Amino acid sequence: MTSTNGPLRVGIGGPVGSGKTALMEQLCKRFRDRYEICAITNDIYTKEDARILTVAGALPEERILGVETGGCPHTAIREDASINLAAVAEMSRRFPKLDLVLIESGGDNLAATFSPELADITLYVIDVAGGEKIPRKGGPGITRSDLLIVNKTDLAPLVGADLSVMESDTQRMRGTRPYVFASLREGTGADAVARFVEEAGGLGR
């Protein structure tokens, strides 16, 4: 359902390699038959993530737009989001009945956040391979995102990470804010993320 303010805009952030593109792919495949959806990816000097989504068949090519941010990727989603706002406007022009735009940030540090002008809902992805201590390091993405995804749980035995410790730290850092433990390459946890986006974003109402 497209609101009078345009499509629901969901920002997906997280460090390099945490699984943002995998989450984009999983959400696109779950939503594409039910909603009018587009995807916008941010890379510093390439459009690699857009290419990955296209090759994976997540959406038709014309519904995926790659943005080259240059410089610091967090600037393009917060301090000066104009390039991404223009991308959202372009997709809305192409598809007037657009319900949902997924916006993947370029990989950045734990302090990166989306401007509320750009994203209605923010999802933040961290991964177990980054170390058991990641949740307790905090940062706006971990503590204030609308939903935190702790990805690559399947790698915990290989990197010596205790998932129960990570969950305890996640609960402590986030308070009542929701989180999901996931293995997005296999699709584990993706349904829970999709449900959250639908419920929090009022899709289908």
Curated annotation (Swiss-Prot):
Instruction: Return the SUPFAM superfamilies for the record.
Output: P-loop containing nucleoside triphosphate hydrolases
Q: Where does GTP bind?
A: 14-21
Q: Record keywords: GTP-binding included? A: yes
Q: What does this protein do?
A: Facilitates the functional incorporation of the urease nickel metallocenter. This process requires GTP hydrolysis, probably effectuated by UreG.
Q: Which HAMAP family match?
A: UreG
Family label: Belongs to the SIMIBI class G3E GTPase family. UreG subfamily.
**What is this protein's record name?**
Urease accessory protein UreG 1
Q: Which organism is it from?
A: Methylobacterium radiotolerans (strain ATCC 27329 / DSM 1819 / JCM 2831 / NBRC 15690 / NCIMB 10815 / 0-1)
